[in-house]
């Protein structure tokens, strides 16, 4: 149950960021969105835009995710989804040094995070 998992993550001090919510692949039978059971949305996934990507390449996945996050007032997270040494590009920036994973969670929820793609496009 999605709600139960969301509550368990929170009970452990974590946050839930919906990874690549609009990716369509044969192993993802349908797009399922849970705006009330996530704390953030992965708006930037490097494999969706990188020239080095050999799968999942579709810029619309990121564009839809960013619009979805904004529509629901959710912070935007980013990641490289790096499965090879050729894949780099997405990440998170903070204006201060984070002390640990709990500080990371607090900073994301407080809107301190900036998601970036390719070192030049920032969201958040």
What role is predicted for each listed range?
Residues 3, 7, 15, 24-124:
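Charged catalytic cores and adjacent phosphate/nucleic-acid-binding surfaces used
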Residues 18-20:
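Catalytic beta/alpha-barrel core
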Residues 10:
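Active-site and NAD+-binding cores of ADP-ribose-processing enzymes
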